[in-house]
UniProtKB/Swiss-Prot annotation:
Keyword set, alphabetical order: Cytoplasm, Endonuclease, Hydrolase, Manganese, Metal-binding, Nuclease
Upper lineage: Archaea, Methanobacteriati, Thermoplasmatota, Thermoplasmata, Thermoplasmatales
Function, in words: Endonuclease that specifically degrades the RNA of RNA-DNA hybrids.
EC number per UniProt: 3.1.26.4
UniProt binding sites for a divalent metal cation: 7-8, 97
Cofactor(s) required, per the database record: Mn(2+); Mg(2+)
Entry GO CC: cytoplasm; ribonuclease H2 complex
Record-linked CDD domains: RNase_HII_archaea_like
Protein name: Ribonuclease HII
Keyword field contains Disulfide bond: no
Catalytic activity, reaction form: Endonucleolytic cleavage to 5'-phosphomonoester
Database matches in Pfam families: RNase_HII
């Protein structure tokens, strides 16, 4: 039976885009797993198989993420992009790695908007193969985007607030008034605190 899976990569970083991806297939006859549980090399190998399936994705830049956080919420932005992906789905049944604390609420919203059978589950990227496949697409594409940014701006680490290398990069950029507007999420508390500390 044809099913689709949707997942995102890069929800939490203070630097770089978020990627939402969807994969649709009748069956997945090769190994997949939650992208977070795989090494980079293993993800890349599986990506070659997964990318041969029907898939769609969106790369969402930091400015759009900031705008959503200011006006509504990050969840609201993900709802919008999940809806766009579902409307492009080749199948009637779509599994989503739930980004809302309330699974049934998100299911209801997306069912009402799309008319599709939407099933939202926490840890779906780990438990449902088609969502694992989507998580690999999203993660590898985001990793590729991060490498492109590093080739322009230098090595800023993982981009996550918990990464000391990322924090050093941000602090150095703020002190030196470097133009990193295109890559940083200014609405993140991490960035705001660093800016405040150097006013």
């Amino acid at each position: 039976m044809c099913v689709c899976g949707i997942d995102e990569a890069g929800r939490g970083p203070v630097i770089g885009p978020m990627v939402m991806a969807m994969v649709c297939a009748d069956d997945i006859n090769f190994y997949v797993n939650d992208s977070k549980l795989l090494t980079r090399n293993k993800r890349s190998l599986i990506f070659n198989d997964v990318s041969g399936l029907y898939h769609k994705y969106y790369i969402i830049n930091p400015a759009e993420i900031d705008d959503a956080v200011k006006k509504h919420s990050l969840n609201n932005l993900e709802e919008q992009y999940a809806e766009k992906l579902i409307l492009k789905a080749e199948c009637e049944k779509i599994y989503i790695d739930c980004f809302d604390v309330n699974e049934s609420r998100l299911e209801r919203i997306l069912k009402d908007r799309t008319g599709k059978e939407v099933i939202c589950r926490h840890h779906a990227d780990r438990d449902i193969k088609i969502v694992s496949a989507a998580s690999i697409i999203a993660k590898v594409l985001r990793d590729n985007e991060i490498e492109k940014l590093k080739s322009i701006y230098g090595d800023f680490g993982s981009g996550y607030p918990s990464d000391p290398k990322t924090l050093r990069f941000l602090e150095h950029s703020i002190i030196n008034h470097d133009n990193i507007d295109n890559i940083v999420r200014k609405e993140w508390k991490t960035y705001k605190n660093l800016v405040q500390g150097h006013i």
